[in-house]
Amino acid sequence: MDLLENYYNELCELIYQIPLNNDGWFNFSKELLKILNVSYVHIQAIDFSYNVLSFSNGVGLLPLEAYASAELDYLRYPTEADPRWGKFLDPERKGWYQCHTHVSEEFVEKSDLYQKILLPCGLRYVA
């Protein structure tokens, strides 16, 4: 049996547990974090009819309080401070979104948002 197939079955089982368990999204995200070997997993559902998030859940290696504090600080910045949103929310976008294709290192070095909030939490990249 292929290793990825094992993960697939495991993740499917965790998905089925989400509506049955208060910690369902947390458990699923924690396992995805481990499988992908990343520092943060943020799952979002976007309603493109209104360009709003209808669901948002993030889990990472840092304590939840660190991410909650960072999210509150993040909300104080105008959306224009984060160039990822325009590309991410583009209803014409096809396929997987990866920010490294248009957010340069030079921009990151000069960005108050990246320097004060995103980088300290290990949130440089989005895919």
Model segments located where?
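Regulatory input/activation interfaces that engage signals or partners
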Residues: 10-127
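Short, low-complexity N-terminal regulatory "tails/caps" that precede and couple sensory modules
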Residues: 1-5, 9-12
